Amino acid sequence: MALLRSLSAQRTAISLVYGRNSSKSSNSVAVAACRSFHQRGSGSTSIAGEGAASESTRGVNGARFLHSGDRPLQASTLVQPEVVSSETVKRSMKQESSQEKNPSPAGSPQRDPLDVSFNDPIAAFKSKTTGELIRAYLVYMICSSEKLVEHNMTLMKLARNLLGQKLFVLLMKSSFYGHFVAGENRHTIVPALERLRSFGVKPILDYSVEEDITQEEAEKREVESSVSSAGDKKEEGSMPQYHVDKSFADRRYKVSSARTYFYLNEATCERNMEIFIKCLEAVSDDDRKAPRAVATGATFGTGITAIKLTALGRPQLLLQLSEVIMRTRKYMEDMVGGQGNVLTHHKTIKDLEKYYATLGDNKDVKEFLNNVTSDKEGILHLFPWSGIVDEDSQLSDTFRVPDPQTGQMRRLISQIPPKEEEMFRNMIRRLNTIVKAAADLDVRIMVDAEQTYFQPAISRITLEMMRKYNKDKAIVFNTYQCYLRETFREVNTDLEQAKRQNFYFGAKLVRGAYMDQERDRAKSLGYPDPVNPTFEATTDMYHRTLSECLRRIKLMKDCDDDARKIGIMVASHNEDTVRFAIQQMKEIGISPEDKVICFGQLLGMCDYITFPLGQAGYSAYKYIPYGPVEEVLPYLSRRAQENKGVLKKIKKEKRLLLSEIRRRLMRGQLFYKPKGNYVPI
């Protein structure tokens, strides 16, 4: 009873009920802010151009209404416990008991106060049976052993050989597989999705089957698929990071938290497309639109599917396209000065005509200028990307620019053979098919970030998919890795494009998955390290980027604009970052019901963050892997490796698990059956 009183007292003392900030700006300030927001000048939206370096070093000082400082917020800044009397403790215990015995009636969804210290084991694990808690504790105990984790794949294969298939599958379902994976197929995962939803949490589905291939095979496939049949020509001005290097051909090197696809052939890419579409159907609630879907209403149109572009096409094409994008930026910088994306220079077609004036009446230059993407505020892109994503442009003919000295058209991409042009159109066709299916099924797509040598192409294509499909709501989301030095600038640029082309912008913010690999590759190939120097710098990048998104959302709300034109997922296992986001929302008057901010964590990790958020009415997601036991072993191996690297988080999760197991034993709840009455936002 002493332990129970202690837990109840702690929970009562530090609970924080979300209160929307009711303070309003004066009309004159709001009008001024609206004018500033709708201005398209260089200073109106904090787009990082020539002053990016100073902006990066000083944080978001221009938006101090968002937060009191640039350092991560501690729980103490959000929760100020008061002295709790014994009567309050008894009342809290009585309320807890009453909730368990008499949940809210149907039609009256339950909402709990949020403990932003994330120290409440009851809120964290009320969706779990006691057996599941014991399993989780044992899994984390194993993840705490470096030797076991280091050789986990070898041990799993050994167990498979010794036990045979049936016993091995039973063992895995009782341990790692049961903890980290929802089920074997889209039918067997339905109970897990329904239970998640009943406790306020929504799914991001991912079919997590991975090939278990050797390093030698991975390197062979990557080298073959990353070089054109015309050869790997490194012309003048080429950039080494966008060419394959055998030393880093196995893209799994030092990567534990992301899946890797290796290109085999076009048929494999077609199968991957079909798998992604099946994921969409699995999260769709509308059986009339998806007759093969499991019509349970388990996600009610709020589900998400994650995809990777490297699963849909030949990586060589993404490498070449990424190099084109970066060489285009360099071309523009050399011509007009400054740094950054083309649209950040705020140049017009007339400005370009002046630059090319010395070339005279040049037919090729005129044709080039006719194809430049621009609006009344200036140039957005030098190339017609809309034609590229609509599958009606030839890459070799598209990416040419006038030489300012000679007037001759200069290729920014080497001549692509017709067969590879067709492969690129196939990749774009597959992506269009997936996104169109998502739009028809009312399911969102999150395009995962990948290595920096692929990312310029991935982001460019994803933004064009947003422009094409995010006309009425955010269907397509891009992923931004905050361990990269350029993330703040890139997000600002993409937000500006979304505003100017009037489409809904969706972003998933993550810390990143490829840090060690990126650093080693940059050092080996001799290009600048793209990664932030410290953990703290990455945290600052995450918080500044999130703050800028929230600043723009606030301005849209103040101007009676549709604030849902910007949607952000805070995909983080970092408590300080989650607290920071909650505090920002509260301070500037963004409520969970506004549906512009959501939170996400992996299944089997940080339940003490996800479930309290969902039960308090925030939009909370779990990344839900599924697939046959023996085919998800590489995924399980990576989860074990990732948990080894976050021992501090494991320590807290183990402590909370043990606390809840003891509480249930003391209260005779060994056979507790989870039953929730929460409705996700």
From Swiss-Prot:
Location relative to the cell: Mitochondrion matrix
Keyword annotations of the record: FAD, Flavoprotein, Mitochondrion, Oxidoreductase, Proline metabolism, Transit peptide
Chief location category: mitochondrion
Basic and acidic residues biased stretches: 88-99
Tissue specificity statement from the Swiss-Prot or TrEMBL entry: Most abundant in developing nervous system.
EC assignment: 1.5.5.2
Pfam families in alphabetical order: Pro_dh
Catalysed conversion reaction: L-proline + a quinone = (S)-1-pyrroline-5-carboxylate + a quinol + H(+)
Transit peptide: 1-30
Region feature Disordered, mapped onto this chain: 76-113, 216-239
Ranges of Polar residues composition bias in the record: 76-87
Pathway terms, separated by semicolons: Amino-acid degradation; L-proline degradation into L-glutamate; L-glutamate from L-proline: step 1/2
Phenotype reported upon loss of the gene: Flies exhibit reduced proline oxidase activity which produces sluggish behavior.
Enzyme type, top EC level: oxidoreductase
InterPro entries to which the protein is assigned, alphabetical: FAD-linked_oxidoreductase-like, Proline_DH_dom, Proline_oxidase
Essential cofactor(s): FAD
An example molecular function term from Gene Ontology annotations: proline dehydrogenase activity
GO biological process, one term: phototaxis
PANTHER family: PROLINE DEHYDROGENASE 1, MITOCHONDRIAL, PROLINE OXIDASE
Family of this protein: Belongs to the proline oxidase family.
Protein name: Proline dehydrogenase 1, mitochondrial
Recorded name of the encoding gene: slgA
